[in-house]
């Protein structure tokens, strides 16, 4: 069997996005694939690879949708200049404005995730870099550069070039995933909450030796200074928030507890308002010996527009008990100090450990094109 790489080689196994009546399966070295989830029996079918309305050869597995405007923001990255290209789409999913090549990336970096705020797109430039020449030497193309100083870059959301981009050195801050970002003080301060990966030299080959602590970084736009506050010293990643607060100031996040990563032995709730006062974990659920979960996901009890509290909802996840060989789906009370399990459904077959998840509502299922 011959494979045409121009028709896609991605596994579409990293993340999921529901947008404009379509469920997208994503990975960062290919374009999105549209899949359809049957509302009747849950059967999944592949519709096809998205090739129109996209001018790059790949897209991030972590696009961001602004819950206020409905716009979606994305990017692609690779080992050839421009190393990162930014793009945006209107609320109907149509390409909006030109792609923006970000030439101020000095070398090809591992840019897995990014953030949006009301006025900016926030990009990390971390100590994991790509060195294509290493392939010729029989070595791995991606690896750490311990001499590099990590940076955060702010690009105006509606920029048409990277001439307005500002970079801020943040030594020791290697942001692979983002929890949320927002603006304060009339837009003069940009706040980013994200796990910080260390030691970075173990990020590719030795996940079991990684420790991922959650930090809050504050960028003062007038002075250019950056301050950091540790929110939790625990080994936490795969953080989620109420999606209605994406890009806007939020208070709570729910993160997986590594045992070590990528296995998740429990979920914690972090309160950002406790920043600067020590450990910010305010709720916890441990899954038990030999029981591990996937990325948690927050499901609001009602929409943000209805005026409910930010944490009024549920945290859901798949679990697998390795001792019993049993998989289940659990629903936890997001407001409970113990993240109390309200419901657990034992599943008829194994659900493998994965990367990122998505909760799709009944209304979204029925709206699929």
UniProtKB/Swiss-Prot annotation:
GO terms for biological process: carotene catabolic process. GO terms for molecular function: carotenoid dioxygenase activity; metal ion binding. One of its GO terms (cellular component) is chromoplast. It is found in: Plastid, Chromoplast. Induction: By dehydration. Keywords: Chromoplast, Dioxygenase, Iron, Metal-binding, Oxidoreductase, Plastid, Stress response, Transit peptide. Fe cation binds at residues 62, 112, 177, 356. It catalyses: all-trans-zeaxanthin + 2 O2 = crocetin dialdehyde + 2 3beta-hydroxy-beta-cyclocitral. It comes from the Eukaryota. Cleaves zeaxanthin symmetrically at the 7-8 and 7'-8' double bonds to produce crocetin dialdehyde and hydroxy-beta-cyclocitral, two water-soluble precursors sequestred in vacuoles and involved in the synthesis of saffron pigment and aroma. This is Zeaxanthin 7,8(7',8')-cleavage dioxygenase, chromoplastic. It comes from Crocus sativus (Saffron).
